[in-house]
Amino acid sequence: MGLLEQNQQKVATWVYEMLGAGIESFYTVQNGIKMYYDLASKSYKAIPGQSNFIILNDLRKTNVVWKNSGASVFDIGDGVLNIEFHSKMNTIGGDTLSAINKAIDMAEKDYRGVVIGNDGANFSAGANVGMIFMMAVEQEYDELNMAIKMFQDTMMRVRYSGIPVIVAPH
């Protein structure tokens, strides 16, 4: 007995037919293509329009062109690179700033643009305040000033780059 039945909810007949045919999910991925269960044909069909979307999860294994501990740079096609942060809470620190600079270097030479975006739950929590706090507590003021300068220089590079750099929060 399923959850709906336990709560005295009626389950559609076609759901039982689907389960009887051995199909246990409304959605699946076959050969990298996302599919949905179609009631009329009683089979999976490709989700329409998905060729117009870029799903980073589909590119992670094959399209990485550069990576460090804080971010990855993917070729997303059409001469465009994508920078995806993967630091804790997608915070911005030295590694993510290095990735932004590296992606701009590559794009200005061999590509047409850069997108900074991800498909994580949170786009970015902002600056790595833990790192900033530790520098302040340790009284590493020169290093703190260098970190702030690196951030500012990188943001100016994003703004004035020779190629478009788009930040795409969600």
Features from the language model and the residues they span:
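N-terminal glycine-rich phosphate-binding loop for ADP-containing cofactors
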Residues: 1-121, 129-163, 169-170
